[in-house]
């Protein structure tokens, strides 16, 4: 029995989602009295130069490298086998081995598909339980390894796909994707309208433009939406200062139809009062939207997990997917004028949402590692041969 386990959470800075999930899990462990929690960007610490290059290429996939990323994501999915797994497992291996020897964690959690842990576990015979927390509404084979003890997934759909691949159903827990605790609180909307100087009598369109130029023609879009009667447009630019300054010129023309913000710490507050939102289909953003039942317009998904996320939400009736710039204004305006459709999308979001996913995950992990002395986590009896 582990009375006060040491927890190692491994993540990667490819987008903010994986790191955000890691931090949310860390906070949840601490809230439950587990103080010895380490969060490590394994690839960033092990291979900083390679990581910087691949992060740059990842961000470029949003704008000019879509076909390259499509080839990588779906190509690896098709040919993933023991040779590729063995090659990929070497990334971060040396740093990980040092971490395990020095820190001696009792539990390891991956919020990014890092198979160095289960590979080391298999090769040197360590008995640390390993948990994978999937951060999208789909699954790539790179997440799967027979030495992983349990998987936490967003939906029953993901679980079914994994079972079809060969993962035993008892190793998969449908919890939802961990989101910041602020998204699970109740707040009086009047406070939010006052804080951001918004008009409660107008519909609101929230545009999450991001910091990497992934949403095209934002200024032109805002100009078009500003002409729509009884609509207030709110743009969150993140850390994109150039975009913020560009849009501030529009805002300063005197119209109250546009509000421009940079980085918003408590962005859940804007989610709570918007009629719908234009954004990219990242797994965490979609989970946050589901928590607050925000209808989403998903802008030009990148091939790979973004596209798979978008297809899932579109099929569920929770999202409108935009695949061409020419569709953005017309489809968004039509949705804003269709109250019945907005209500249906809210209900669809409600059906997708799983309450308190971080708490569910942490409680499950702690229960398994406190359950009995010498507890042995469930093992995969057999997995597809390609998963090593």
Curated annotation (Swiss-Prot):
Principal location listed in the UniProt entry: membrane
Quote the pathway field.
Answer: Glycolipid metabolism; diglucosyl-diacylglycerol biosynthesis
Q: Which reaction does it catalyse?
A: a 1,2-diacyl-3-O-(beta-D-glucopyranosyl)-sn-glycerol + UDP-alpha-D-glucose = a 1,2-diacyl-3-O-(beta-D-Glc-(1->6)-beta-D-Glc)-sn-glycerol + UDP + H(+); a 1,2-diacyl-3-O-(beta-D-Glc-(1->6)-beta-D-Glc)-sn-glycerol + UDP-alpha-D-glucose = a 1,2-diacyl-3-O-(beta-D-Glc-(1->6)-beta-D-Glc-(1->6)-beta-D-Glc)-sn-glycerol + UDP + H(+); a 1,2-diacyl-sn-glycerol + UDP-alpha-D-glucose = a 1,2-diacyl-3-O-(beta-D-glucopyranosyl)-sn-glycerol + UDP + H(+)
What's one GO BP annotation on this UniProt entry?
Answer: glycolipid biosynthetic process
A GO molecular-function term, please? Answer: 1,2-diacylglycerol 3-glucosyltransferase activity
Q: Which domain of life is it from?
A: Bacteria
Instruction: Tell me if Ribosomal protein is a UniProt keyword of this record.
Output: no
Entry keywords, A to Z: Carbohydrate metabolism, Cell membrane, Glycosyltransferase, Lipid biosynthesis, Lipid metabolism, Membrane, Transferase
The compartments listed are: Cell membrane
A single GO cellular-component term on record: plasma membrane
What CDD domains has UniProt attached to this entry? GT28_Beta-DGS-like (cd17507)
- Reported EC number(s) for this entry are 2.4.1.315
Among SUPFAM superfamilies, the record links this protein to: UDP-Glycosyltransferase/glycogen phosphorylase (SSF53756)
What NCBIfam families does the record point to? PRK13609.1 (NF010135)
Under PANTHER family, the record lists: MONOGALACTOSYLDIACYLGLYCEROL SYNTHASE, MONOGALACTOSYLDIACYLGLYCEROL SYNTHASE 1, CHLOROPLASTIC
Q: Which family does it belong to?
A: Belongs to the glycosyltransferase 28 family. UgtP subfamily.
Function field: Processive glucosyltransferase involved in the biosynthesis of both the bilayer- and non-bilayer-forming membrane glucolipids. Is able to successively transfer up to three glucosyl residues to diacylglycerol (DAG), thereby catalyzing the formation of beta-monoglucosyl-DAG (3-O-(beta-D-glucopyranosyl)-1,2-diacyl-sn-glycerol), beta-diglucosyl-DAG (3-O-(beta-D-glucopyranosyl-beta-(1->6)-D-glucopyranosyl)-1,2-diacyl-sn-glycerol) and beta-triglucosyl-DAG (3-O-(beta-D-glucopyranosyl-beta-(1->6)-D-glucopyranosyl-beta-(1->6)-D-glucopyranosyl)-1,2-diacyl-sn-glycerol).
Q: Write down what this protein is called.
A: Processive diacylglycerol beta-glucosyltransferase
Q: Which gene encodes it?
A: ugtP
